[in-house]
Amino acid sequence: VRVVLSGATGFLGSAVLARLGAHGAPGAPRTRERPGTAQELTVRAFTRRHVALPAGVEQVHADLARPETLAGVCEGADVLVNAASHVGSDEQQCNLVNDLGTAALMEEARRAGVRRVVHLSTTAVYGRGPHRGASVTDLGPAPGSAASRSRLAGETHALRQGALVLRAGLVTGEGDRWVVPALAELARRVPGLWLGGTGRLSLVAVEDLARLVTAAALRLPAAGGAVHHAVHPQPVRLRDLLRTLAALGLLPPLSGELTWQQCLSLMRANPGRIRERQLELLAQDHFYSGESLWDACRCDPGPGPLARLPGAAAWYRRQLGLV
């Protein structure tokens, strides 16, 4: 099986690359997710510049922001995993990468006759909640940012190519520069349990998401255009997430229930990078039905994102400047 991976140096893409490498390593143990097979796995990763990649990975230089560089990247491939995206606030760059770049990549996949495409997207395409356990068919997209609007546009191009589109929730673990850093900032600016910490969130640890993406890429038949949530099946209570992070020394202990108006007043009195809309995402219910893809891939969801956090604690301490 010949796999092409975009975004191979990013947060999720690097985890998928490591998982693909482990999956294809000689002598790797057979598991529910890696049954006995005589097929050889080869990986081609495209990156914007030369970087060190695991042994045996073919590296090509290409950039979704420069569609002309994508020519031929999918030649000879059986599977394309698109884990590349731009998540900043620059609307022009978001459109260039997430919309136009995805369109160009899917055209390359079509031209090369790639049989299976897995495209990574985000539950942010649903916009503002609260969202409580909805399936993909229960919610209509209502993106509220340049990043989520352009990623929804990218989904359209991928689905036209028959892709399996995976909408990931909040992703934690080594490489996370948004979820836990945002919580750390908000814990300083809005000290207390926001709405009592009752909000439920769809989280997934990056290593578990990488397992799921790999299983979907290698085990599922060509989707013919389908969308799934890529989240851990069990939502996480905000208070449990905050307490786990505090126990690891990543956040100060928080206590005292805050109403929404109190949260907003404290936020405005203590300016920072995180906006009110992002606090809303973290404090209110934003969880989604997530069992179907794990079941289809015959993939164990693992112990859950809270149980995975200790393994990433040292990385987070460095990222947050706590060491």
Question: Which residues does each PLM region occupy?
Answer:
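Conserved beta-loop-beta element that borders a ligand/cofactor-binding pocket
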Residues: E155-G175
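N-terminal Rossmann NAD(P)H-binding glycine-rich loop of SDR-like oxidoreductase domains
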Residues: V1-A25
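NAD(P)H-binding glycine-rich loop region in Rossmannoid oxidoreductase-like domains
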Residues: V51-A52, V57, H61-L100, E108, ...
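Short alpha-helix in the Rossmann-fold core of NAD(P)-dependent oxidoreductases
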Residues: N95-T102, M106, V118, S150-R151, ...
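Conserved Rossmann-fold NAD(P)-dependent oxidoreductase catalytic core, especially the SDR/UDP-sugar
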Residues: A103-A146
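Mid/C-terminal beta-alpha module of Rossmann-like enzyme folds, strongest
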Residues: L212-E276, R317, G321-V323
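Amphipathic terminal alpha-helices
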Residues: G290-D295, D300-V323
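Substrate-positioning beta->alpha
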Residues: R177-P181, L195-L218, G225-H229
